[in-house]
Amino acid sequence: MKHDEQLLIRSTTVLGVIRDGKAALGSDGQMTLGNTVLKHSTRKTRRLYHGQIIAGFAGATADAVTLLDRFEEKLEAFSGRLERAAVELARDWRTDKYLRRLEAMLAIVTAEKALIISGTGDVIEPEDGIVAIGSGSMYALAAARSLLAHTTLSAREIVHESLKIAADICIYTNDHIVIEEV
């Protein structure tokens, strides 16, 4: 992967947390091209399948929207079965020549499950119910794990505080935070 492509994939932070039967997924709003900020309030989350599933993306916007559209089609085809839809999307992503070139990652949550669909078509289900993608993901992930283990904050509050921490550290992440809940 070339340096410019890495910047496209890594230039945001998306974080999802499941706690006490509720899930929250949020992102910052910064859109960058290379080292230039183009927009401060980009929406990188989307509700899917009758509002029961929340997905967020990191990567090239057009590629991510294409993948989200395909994922939504898979959800409809498999009656909202998250894991089956994710595996089928990943299979298509790996085998379809057009999709294989898309540069994006998806983070997906329901009230019970959290998944990451990687740019290589892998489906990853974290053990702790926390999904994080993008350039500030490791900062947000570390903060979320600590807050989940040592506080009684809600999923939404954990996402908000963790994204604020990531925004303080990562130059590709800002503090214009949008959070969705299920």
UniProtKB/Swiss-Prot annotation:
InterPro entries: ATP-dep_Prtase_HsIV_su, Ntn_hydrolases_N, Proteasome_sua/b, Proteasome_suB-type. Keywords: Allosteric enzyme, Cytoplasm, Hydrolase, Metal-binding, Protease, Sodium, Threonine protease. The active site is at residue 12. One of its GO terms (cellular component) is proteasome core complex. It catalyses: ATP-dependent cleavage of peptide bonds with broad specificity. Pfam families: Proteasome. GO terms for molecular function: metal ion binding; threonine-type endopeptidase activity. Its EC number is 3.4.25.2. Na(+) binds at residues 167, 170, 173. It is found in: Cytoplasm. Gene3D superfamilies: Glutamine Phosphoribosylpyrophosphate, subunit 1, domain 1. One of its GO terms (biological process) is proteolysis involved in protein catabolic process. Its main location: cytoplasm. HAMAP family: HslV. Protease subunit of a proteasome-like degradation complex believed to be a general protein degrading machinery. This is ATP-dependent protease subunit HslV. It comes from Chlorobium phaeobacteroides (strain DSM 266 / SMG 266 / 2430). The lineage of its organism: Bacteria, Pseudomonadati, Chlorobiota, Chlorobiia, Chlorobiales.
